[in-house]
C-alpha cells in the first residue's frame, strides 16, 4: 500500500461526502475514467467525472461508508478494492424514477486506480435491482439510453 495513495483516497472521500466538487476533482487525474457497471455508463476526464458526481449528488443525498462486515485492501500500491455502502436518501430523479424520499443503504464494490499521485479510475459494481427496489420501483428502466451509456454505442 502506498501511504500517499491512501492519504489521497481519504481526501477524496472527505470531499465526495461533503459534495465538494472542486475538492473531489482535485484528487483525480485529468485522464480519469469512471465506470458504473450496473448502469453501463462510462465517464472520462474531469468533465465526465463532474457529470458523474452531479448525477449522483442530485439523485441521492448519501455518504460513502464501510460497514462493519465489509472489507478493503490494496492488491498493489496503485490499486484499492473495497466493499462499501451508499447510505442516505433518494432525493432526485433516478433513471426516470421520481424522488421518493426513501432511505437507502446500497452495498457496492469499487476498484480504484492511482497514477502520478492522483486517482485514475473508479469502477463500481452493485445490484441495480436492489437500489431500484429501495427507491420504491420494481421496474428496471431502459438504461441503454442514459447519458454516457456504453450500451448505446
Where do the PLM segments sit?
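C-terminal and inter-domain tail/linker signature
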Residues: 1-153
Amino acid at each position: 500500500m502506498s501511504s500517499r495513495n491512501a492519504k489521497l483516497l481519504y481526501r477524496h472521500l472527505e470531499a465526495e461526502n461533503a459534495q465538494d466538487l472542486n475538492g473531489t476533482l482535485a484528487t483525480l487525474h485529468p485522464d480519469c475514467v469512471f465506470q458504473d457497471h450496473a448502469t453501463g455508463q462510462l465517464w472520462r476526464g474531469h468533465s465526465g467525472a463532474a457529470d458523474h458526481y452531479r448525477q449522483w449528488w442530485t439523485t441521492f443525498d448519501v455518504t460513502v461508508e464501510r460497514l462493519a462486515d465489509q472489507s478493503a485492501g490494496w492488491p498493489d500500491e496503485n490499486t484499492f478494492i473495497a466493499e462499501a455502502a451508499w447510505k442516505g436518501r433518494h432525493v432526485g430523479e433516478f433513471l426516470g424514477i421520481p424522488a421518493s424520499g426513501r432511505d437507502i443503504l446500497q452495498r457496492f464494490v469499487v476498484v480504484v486506480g492511482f497514477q502520478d499521485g492522483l486517482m485514475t479510475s473508479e469502477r463500481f459494481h452493485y445490484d441495480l435491482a436492489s437500489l431500484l427496489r429501495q427507491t420504491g420501483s420494481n421496474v428496471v428502466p431502459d438504461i441503454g439510453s442514459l447519458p454516457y451509456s456504453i450500451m448505446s454505442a
